């Protein structure tokens, strides 16, 4: 466990400042790590590889708590693997973020009174590159602040030349394999961004709308349909009913007049229609609804588009030129004037899709676009998990993954933007269509032009695990570091990004999945569990907390909340608590160094060690084993808790405190404990380093004289256990804890000394008598000693003389008042829980809260009564 090639005894008596100031060391330490190349990856190394990619943040972005959370987990994994002897590669980079970046630069142009069309495509793209050079590197500096151990020399951007070649290569391969095609289909159209967006980029929310029922046809041949989008009725080409619906069988096959027009449309029978919903009849607008489009395909209905790309009505007549919402009101008014409105419901709350970027209401629109045929790709992505080639943590997330990949529709990959990877297809003057690979010659001559669309951002980021390693070239890095060892990412982009990487990785890399493991984490929320958002007023800039408390404090807080696949609540007071933990580590190490703690030489033989020494070494090895197992299972919260409680409770609060009497006594025992304490701190600091790298680097190098804990050996469980010593110290802890609790109950100050008679019933406690007296602030009994309280505790009896130390009368009066309050609380809570009418109406969380109040009242009553029973009569 203690082997460490970087460890040397300090050259001289080490000194640490009295207080830890993160701002004084973090920047310097990080730059030193980078300069020494600790984070770089060598493709020629004989070490086993450990590879993980950064989920590439948008070039428009800055570090938010979600990034900080994710990066903390990845960095912890990578730092541990580096210490374990792996050739580690944490691949950094950024995403070009097509829509988001174009929107940002367009807003900048707007401030100058210009649009992208004023510049033209080439000049606009050049302007975006200029913006990226000036503003796009903000997040890199923030990653350094957090301590991200990425291989900066390998930083990539999804629009880099090499990655662009990868995009062109896989597009050509998919096209040649007939897995990419161009077709006119219904897509999600954003009238603000003026581009198609994918299903997973549509955010649904409940909006107040209207539900209008209107009558189609004339005379006896009429039928009532209901819609929330009356403006689309101008493009209706049929009314559909279920073939088994007896109400409408006489109309199937007939044509009826479409109101407000001179057109007649057929009534068709289709099993898609639910006869139990509404009137059992639906209007069919194939050019403006995905389900209607499918009905139209089955019945050979024409597609009539009624809106342009700005969602403005184009059909000639009184509604031409109106925005869709204006047209909706005007059309309903016109129908009402004709007496065709049967019913109107306002407001009618229903789920409406919005663009995730600009929040504009999405318009389903028939459009010619490029598509990926995902069937065979999605099947391979599902099979890789089913067959165990890729594992998902936590396992219960597999169902969500399968639900997605097993039900994927073909993916619309074209976007009507200027910023992005332009589709590598050229059109000739005579209808020729040529897909051009990176090694192909571009068609030239009069009449040839390239497709104006660009690819969906997720197309290029789907290649990230292998394009960043040089693919399609067969590079040393690709051979060494593919597939990735693990992907750490949020469950919220399981479908956006993870599934696409799986599909493309398996396809491009001959069936080899892009990673062995997918470790999913939750979303960061505020301390009340609410989503963080600027609009909610609860968004936090992590740099503010890092400035105030240090990067280690933020990292430890985030790791301690990271249960697999579960959302993470976080509040500033929790970060402050983690800062206190860093200070505790600092102060304990400083005390140890001032009292002779050392890593020099071998550990003293077991027979020279005290029970306290053997106990802490036993617990140390058990903690190493526990932390290792939890790391391997991606249980960051549990391993952080294990480290916290071992370091704070067992090392600092118990071992260091118990050792103080040994150090004060001097001699050989003090030397032995000094070496044991040095060992424990050395290993503990190495265990903590992946999560809190800065404070551990400062302390470990001071303690050991080693070059850097970044490249130190990861601790290994030696197998040493001493159950007898553990039991002995547990008994000792019980004695001290029980008497401390009694002292606190009696209102004694922590440092207040009390005359006491200490009788050790357990002989194993005899060597600890001095420590017991010191920690409990017990002073020897004098001639006038009179025991006013006797405490029989595990292995010992402690008689205390409290006369003159507390006012017995006042204390009994205070406790009696507290007891009465607790009994009143119990009665009130019990009455509510005994009220059946209340229980029937109250929400579960309210009932649970009252049950908690009752349980606490019971605990308080028992505790206060015990204090009164132990207290002498006045």
Curated annotation (Swiss-Prot):
Monomer. It comes from the Bacteria. Its EC number is 6.1.1.9. ATP binds at residue 534. A motif ('HIGH' region) lies at residues 57-67. The keyword Transcription does not apply. PANTHER family: VALINE--TRNA LIGASE, CHLOROPLASTIC_MITOCHONDRIAL 2, VALYL-TRNA SYNTHETASES. It catalyses: tRNA(Val) + L-valine + ATP = L-valyl-tRNA(Val) + AMP + diphosphate. The lineage of its organism: Bacteria, Bacillati, Actinomycetota, Actinomycetes, Kitasatosporales. Its main location: cytoplasm. ValRS has two distinct active sites: one for aminoacylation and one for editing. The misactivated threonine is translocated from the active site to the editing site. Residues 806-871 form a coiled coil. HAMAP family: Val_tRNA_synth_type1. Residues 1-23 are annotated as: Disordered. This is Valine--tRNA ligase. The keyword Ligase applies. Catalyzes the attachment of valine to tRNA(Val). As ValRS can inadvertently accommodate and process structurally similar amino acids such as threonine, to avoid such errors, it has a 'posttransfer' editing activity that hydrolyzes mischarged Thr-tRNA(Val) in a tRNA-dependent manner. A motif ('KMSKS' region) lies at residues 531-535. Keywords: Aminoacyl-tRNA synthetase, ATP-binding, Coiled coil, Cytoplasm, Ligase, Nucleotide-binding, Protein biosynthesis. GO terms for molecular function: aminoacyl-tRNA deacylase activity; ATP binding; valine-tRNA ligase activity.
């Amino acid at each position: 466990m203690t082997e460490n090639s970087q460890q040397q005894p300090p050259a001289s008596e080490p000194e640490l400042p009295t207080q830890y100031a993160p701002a004084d060391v973090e920047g310097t330490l990080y730059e030193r790590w980078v300069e020494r190349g600790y984070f770089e990856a060598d493709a020629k190394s004989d070490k086993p590889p450990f590879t993980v990619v950064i989920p590439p943040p948008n070039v428009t972005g800055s570090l938010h708590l979600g990034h900080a959370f994710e990066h903390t987990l990845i960095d912890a994994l990578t730092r541990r693997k580096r210490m374990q002897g792996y050739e580690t590669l944490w691949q950094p980079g950024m995403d070009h973020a097509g829509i988001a970046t174009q929107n940002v630069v367009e807003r900048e142009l707007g401030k100058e009174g210009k649009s992208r069309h004023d510049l033209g495509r080439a000049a606009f793209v050049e302007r975006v590159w200029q913006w990226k050079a000036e503003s796009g590197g903000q997040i890199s500096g923030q990653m350094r602040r957090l301590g991200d151990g990425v291989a900066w020399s390998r930083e990539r951007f999804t629009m880099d030349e090499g990655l662009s070649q990868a995009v062109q290569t896989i597009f050509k391969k998919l096209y040649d394999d007939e897995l990419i095609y161009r077709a006119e289909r219904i897509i999600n159209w954003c009238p603000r961004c003026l581009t198609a967006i994918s299903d997973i980029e549509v955010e649904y929310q409940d909006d107040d709308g209207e539900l209008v029922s209107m009558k189609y046809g004339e005379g006896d041949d009429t039928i009532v349909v209901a819609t929330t989008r009356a403006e689309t009725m101008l493009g209706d080409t049929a009314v559909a009913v279920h073939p088994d619906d007896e109400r409408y069988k006489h109309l199937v096959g007939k044509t009826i007049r479409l109101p407000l027009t001179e057109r007649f449309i057929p009534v068709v029978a289709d099993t898609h229609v639910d006869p139990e919903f509404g009137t059992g009849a639906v209007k069919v607008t194939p050019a403006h609804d995905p389900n209607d489009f499918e009905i139209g395909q089955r019945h050979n209905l024409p597609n009539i588009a009624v809106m342009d790309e700005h969602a403005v009505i184009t059909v000639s007549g009184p509604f031409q030129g109106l925005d869709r919402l204006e047209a909706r009101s005007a059309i309903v008014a016109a129908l009402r004037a004709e007496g065709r409105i049967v019913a109107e419901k306002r407001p009618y709350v229903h789920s409406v899709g919005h663009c995730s970027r600009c929040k504009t209401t999405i318009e389903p629109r028939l459009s010619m676009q490029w598509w990926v045929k995902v069937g065979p790709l999605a099947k391979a992505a599902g099979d890789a998990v089913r067959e165990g080639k890729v594992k998902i943590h936590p396992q219960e997330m597999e169902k969500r993954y399968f639900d997605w990949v097993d039900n994927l529709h073909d993916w619309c990959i074209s976007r009507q933007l200027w910023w992005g990877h332009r589709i590598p297809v050229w059109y000739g003057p005579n209808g020729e269509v040529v897909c051009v690979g990176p090694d192909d010659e571009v068609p030239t001559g009069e009449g040839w032009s390239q497709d104006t669309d660009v690819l969906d951002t997720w197309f290029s980021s789907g290649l990230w695990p292998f394009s960043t390693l040089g693919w399609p070239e067969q590079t040393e890095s690709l051979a060494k570091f593919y597939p990735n060892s693990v992907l750490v990412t949020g469950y919220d982009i399981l479908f956006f990004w993870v599934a696409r990487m799986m599909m493309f990785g398996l396809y491009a890399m001959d069936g080899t999945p892009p990673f062995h493991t997918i470790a999913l984490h939750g979303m960061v929320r505020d301390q009340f569990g609410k989503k963080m958002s600027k609009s909610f007023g609860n968004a936090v800039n992590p740099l503010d907390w890092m400035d105030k408390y240090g990067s280690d404090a933020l990292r430890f807080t985030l790791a301690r909340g990271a249960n697999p696949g579960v959302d993470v609540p976080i509040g500033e007071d929790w970060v402050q608590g983690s800062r206190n933990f860093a200070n505790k580590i600092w102060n304990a190490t400083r005390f140890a160094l001032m009292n002779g703690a050392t890593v020099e030489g071998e550990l003293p033989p077991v027979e020279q060690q005290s029970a306290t020494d053997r106990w802490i070494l036993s617990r140390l090895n058990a903690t190493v084993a526990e932390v290792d197992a939890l790391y391997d299972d991606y249980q960051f919260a549990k391993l952080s808790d294990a480290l916290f409680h071992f370091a704070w409770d067992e090392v600092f609060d118990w071992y260091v405190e118990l050792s103080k009497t040994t150090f004060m006594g001097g001699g050989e025992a003090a030397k032995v404990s000094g070496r044991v304490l040095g060992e424990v701190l050395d290993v503990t600091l190495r265990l903590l380093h992946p999560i809190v790298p800065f404070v551990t680097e400062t302390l470990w190098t001071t303690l050991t004289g080693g070059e850097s804990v970044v490249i130190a050996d990861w601790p290994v469980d030696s197998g040493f256990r001493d159950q007898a010593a553990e039991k002995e110290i547990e008994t000792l802890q019980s004695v001290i804890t029980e008497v401390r609790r009694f002292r606190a109950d009696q209102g004694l100050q922590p440092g207040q000394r009390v005359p006491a008679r200490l009788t050790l019933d357990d002989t194993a406690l005899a060597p600890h008598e001095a420590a017991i007296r010191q920690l409990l602030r017990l002073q020897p009994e004098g001639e006038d000693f009179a025991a006013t309280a006797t405490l029989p505790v595990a292995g010992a009896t402690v008689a205390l003389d409290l006369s003159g130390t507390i006012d017995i009368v006042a204390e009994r009066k205070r406790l009696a008042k507290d007891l009465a309050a607790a009994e009143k609380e119990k009665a009130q809570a019990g009455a509510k829980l005994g009220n059946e009418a209340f229980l029937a109406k109250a929400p579960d969380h309210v009932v649970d809260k009252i049950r908690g109040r009752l349980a606490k009242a019971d605990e308080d009553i028992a505790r206060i009564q015990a204090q009164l029973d132990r207290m002498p009569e006045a």
